Amino acid sequence: PEGRWEDFETYWSCSKQWEGKQFGEKDARSGLYNQCNFGIYWTAEAMKEAYVLSGDAEWLDLGEQALAEASLYQQIWQAPFFPVPTVGGFGVMTSDDEWNDARQSLFALTYLDYYRLTGNESYRARAEWALRASFYMMYCPENAGVRAIYERVHPHFDERDYGFHMENFNHHDGTPVDGLGEFTIFDWGCGAAAASLPEFK
């Protein structure tokens, strides 16, 4: 009820604590606790599974409440200040500036499940946009603008690197890398996106 979605990533990952952002304290400007949306995601997943197992509609209602909060993190516009597509992707938390995060491929499946349980078309639309956004950062011919950024930052890239995928956009340690970030693993980028795609067939 407090909107307190704090976890490890909120304070001890790449968006660290500082005097204006302390664990357990509300943000002075917004009056909210600092939030990371993974706790919201896992809560929506847990409530969904509780409903499926029990048939008790209260679990579904609680899950939809959590999903409503998660929806606040979905990018519903093309940000004019970013050179990559943004519509449908997900940010990470209230106190960093990462966009198009790989978690959107997981969120896509959660929205799809809620659509199947409720028939709510807005969940289906959010699921499809989140899935589409899961491929925005992939290095491939279909993403010409993103491909050009990769090749500018990594001049050695060529067709053998097609399918490469950064974790998100604008995730960096201060090193100027055109917003590409410096972290990727198969299951948090291209692998997560590819694994979610067949679920929509």
Segments (PLM) and residue ranges:
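Glycan-recognition and catalytic cores of secretory/periplasmic carbohydrate-active enzymes
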Residues: 1-201
